[in-house]
């Protein structure tokens, strides 16, 4: 809970502070961090557009709080986001996929929007010139990490307190999607890399 939950906390509350009424885009919306992001963002009053890797994950993403769900490889992400937001785009994208979604995610942003790339499930994002941000509407790009946000004890305590409050008030429910015996750890890694998993993955000794 702590690693994924604290990651969601700093993304939503500090990197870009989600506001009531915001349309936001979350990739890997059925994943471990993504599912927490979607639930928590909905509780904050945001409207979540979730991106998932297959049709099989659509229903789960909706249960986790997504108002709209798009499927990679099937939906045109940019066109659908612009349609959903009536041409405005979103103020923030939370992307943990990386290479496969990077440029499409940038093109989903409203002018002055923020691209938050916090994971590389499909490989690292491509190199690009800062001018790409300028020509897309003076966008902001950040690659945050949890440990910079909790380096000070007071920051860790405050973040953990907010996370536990979200869990105990049922704004966030932790979802274990699959369990593997420790002897099948290699298979668990293969399934994670192939993006076959949903929610959190647990290894059982």
Question: What is each model feature region?
Answer:
Residues 1-14, 27-30:
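A glycine-rich, Thr/Ser-enriched phosphate-binding loop motif common to dinucleotide/cofactor-binding enzymes
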Residues 17-23, 87-88:
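Short helix-loop-beta connector
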Residues 26, 42-101, 152:
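Adenosine-nucleotide cofactor-binding segment
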Residues 33:
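Hydrophobic/small residue at the entry helix of a nucleotide-binding pocket
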Residues 36-40:
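Rossmann-fold NAD(P)-dependent oxidoreductase module
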Residues 44, 52, 100-171, 205:
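Glycine-rich phosphate-binding loop and adjacent beta-alpha segment
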Residues 153-205:
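C-terminal hydrophobic helical "lid"/dimerization subdomain
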């Amino acid at each position: 809970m702590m690693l994924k939950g604290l990651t969601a906390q700093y993304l939503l509350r500090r990197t870009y502070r989600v506001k009531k009424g915001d349309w936001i885009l979350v990739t890997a919306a059925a994943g471990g961090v993504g599912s927490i992001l979607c639930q928590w963002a909905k509780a904050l009053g945001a409207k979540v557009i979730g991106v998932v890797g297959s049709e099989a994950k659509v229903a789960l993403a909706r249960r986790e709080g997504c108002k709209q769900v798009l499927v990679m490889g099937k939906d045109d992400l940019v066109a659908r986001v612009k349609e959903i937001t009536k041409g405005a785009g979103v103020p923030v994208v939370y992307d943990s996929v990386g290479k496969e979604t990077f440029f499409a995610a940038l093109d989903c942003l409203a002018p002055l929007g923020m691209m938050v790339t916090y994971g590389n499930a499909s490989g690292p994002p491509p190199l690009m010139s800062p001018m790409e941000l300028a020509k897309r509407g003076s966008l902001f790009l950040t690659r945050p990490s949890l440990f910079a946000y909790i380096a000070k004890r007071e920051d860790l305590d405050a973040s953990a307190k907010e996370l536990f409050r979200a869990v105990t008030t049922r704004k966030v429910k932790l979802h274990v999607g699959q369990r593997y015996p420790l002897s099948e750890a290699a298979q668990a890694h293969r399934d994670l890399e192939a993006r076959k998993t949903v929610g959190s993955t647990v290894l059982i000794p």
